[in-house]
Swiss-Prot record:
Naturally occurring in which organism (per UniProt): Rickettsia felis (strain ATCC VR-1525 / URRWXCal2) (Rickettsia azadi)
GO biological process: negative regulation of DNA-templated transcription initiation
Principal subcellular localization: cytoplasm
Annotated compartments: Cytoplasm, Nucleoid
Keyword Cytoplasm set for record: yes
Cited Pfam families: MraZ (PF02381)
Family: Belongs to the MraZ family.
Protein name per Swiss-Prot or TrEMBL: Transcriptional regulator MraZ
């Protein structure tokens, strides 16, 4: 399966290392880079994480914008300028940069949340708060997922 699914909470050690869930690493197995690309979410106080192929899709979408527009500059700065490549070590861990940990409020634990083509890394209590609001929105908007056929 090529989709990031489920939620996991893993510890972050004193060297800022955290183990990426094995099934997430399996999804990334087809990527050319043995690791992930991480950048601060522009929607939430979390870290968005993906493979090189998704970054390429984002690049293509951003390049459709006017090259001198504020929007394009903002997206390029926030996604590409703030992105970091995180290599897996022999145990499937990555080292989270302090800037990303600070953005997400992560200290001793990290909550991995599958979002299909990406996954997010949250401070666990912050994710629980977000989950409550997401459940309400999903319930209110559930009819938008009807089959259009």
């Amino acid at each position: 399966m090529n989709v990031f699914l489920s939620k996991y909470v893993n510890g972050v050690d004193k060297k800022s290392r955290v183990s990426v869930p094995a099934n997430y690493r399996a999804v990334l197995g087809k990527e050319l880079f043995n690791g992930v690309i991480a950048y601060p979410s522009i929607r939430n106080d979390c870290i968005e994480v993906c493979g090189i192929s998704h970054i390429e899709k984002l690049r293509q979408m951003i390049e459709t914008l006017d090259p001198y527009s504020e929007e394009r500059d903002a997206f390029e700065t926030m996604i590409f300028g703030e992105a970091v490549q995180l290599s897996f070590d022999g145990e499937g861990r990555v080292i989270l940069p302090q800037s990303l940990m600070k953005h997400a409020g992560i200290e001793e634990q990290a909550c991995f949340v599958g979002k299909g083509v990406i996954f997010e890394i949250w401070q666990p209590q912050n994710f629980e708060k977000y989950l409550n609001s997401a459940q309400k929105i999903a319930h209110e908007k559930r009819l938008t997922l009807r089959n259009a056929n």
